[in-house]
Amino acid sequence: MVRVTTMLASVTLLTRNARAATPALAVLALGFSLVPIVLLHLLTIETMNPVRDVISDYVFPDGGAVLLGCASLSLAAASLLARQVLLANGLPRLSLESVLLALWAAGLVVATFFPTDPTRFESSFSGAVHRYAGATMFVSLPLAGWLLARRYREATALRWLSLAAGIASFAFLLAHLPLLENSVPEFLGLFERVLYALLYAELFALVAVAKSEVDA
């Protein structure tokens, strides 16, 4: 009986330690996902215009698909790690927040394996899937963050970053409507990079909320 009790205590301790380490793993995954993006920017500085060209266009230079894929999959992993921490600390698995975080991560994975089309080229099946995945991503994460901030009242930073990301996402998606396709702004790439900066900031704030739940 004593041995069983000791084993159960050890398992409980390991579970707690793993749960406590998960937010740190999420931060590491977020940081790692930025490395390929920085490399892509440096490697394509003479061939791509970061003000005009969107991030998805990094798939076209040699090696770009691999680096961009690493960034997207690392970002998805970080998001799922943060989600798992929240689930382990009481967030219902089928709550809207949980589903939206899963959709954001799924959108990243789908967009990775269905690359975009070159700007102003006729849309392919892969390009269409990529755009729908992107739309899912840009709607899901800001809304998830906003709802989580309502659930965790102390998450002020998450609330405002989610609002800013939501407004930026809405404006960015407007530029991709079919009626506006022929008047895509020349600064679309810069605008998307600002949007991603907000999304990253939101994710770091989300991980902070998850960590506070572990520490509570």
Stretches found by the model and what they are:
Residues 13-212:
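Hydrophobic, aromatic-enriched alpha-helical segments typical of multi-pass transmembrane helices
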